[in-house]
Amino acid sequence: MGSLDHLGAIVRDLGAGAARWEKLGFLLSPVSRQRGKMPGRDEDGPWATANRCAILQRGYLELIGVVEPALYNPWTKFLDRFEGLHLLALRVPDADAAFAELSRRTGTLNAPVQRARNLDVDGVEKTMRFRNIFSRDEAYPEGRYIVLEHQTPEYLWQPRYQTHPNGAIALEAALVCAEDVPAQRKRLETLVGAPALEGTDGVQRFAPAGGGRIELHGAEAFAARYGWKPPALPAFAGVEVRFADRERAAAHMEDNGIPVQRGEEWLVAPAHTNGFMLRLAP
């Protein structure tokens, strides 16, 4: 089912969260206010939150955070779990075709909805359009899945946002952590449309047809391997990012005072990333 498109972290303070990502060496897109359905109102309205993104050559990382606390916040239940990763998106060429295929496997996804957002493209305001299929939160305790059709991808993947001080170039993998591995595996197999391949390390890996990976880790094995696990399970627990030069990326982070664990895997701890494990691809 498509390709790994992006992962989204949600934090209580967008400014503080953005500063952490910038310290890691990610260049972030401008602040974009969020709006949508409001309780007790028929028309859409402004939310308490906004987002900024680290746009990579392949995929991106989204940061959602509170900017106006007095307004309605649709992300409260996620923040009540923890600050960290709560969104995992797969990209497809046609949302209607994807929904038809997914509906043959499960009834836990909502029909595609049209979305639009205005943004600056080389000094001209353009309307970015996309269609989202959202998972139903009650069926997916680990977080929210989005199956996404980009209708104007050129407005999101602007070259000026793809040159990062740390040399980040691609989103390679999402790391999922669960105590009930069989149940989590079943949910992922249903979404991806293909079985997992279990490695010699016990990690179950899903490979969406269009690219990227989703890794499923058992909770205790994840904690033993990384020295940390999310405060609530199941959860989206980490990301793997590829850099043009891993050594230079790590040095950039260390020069900014961020420790990089260099062992079999190169890692940055959740305290520096907004609540998830960052793995630097070899």
Enumerate the predicted regions with their spans:
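N-terminal beta-loop-helix "entrance" segment that forms/cooperates
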Residues: 38-43
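Glyoxalase I/VOC metalloenzyme domain signal
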Residues: 1-5, 9-29, 45-115, 120-282
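A short beta-strand-loop structural module common to alpha/beta enzyme folds
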Residues: 29-36
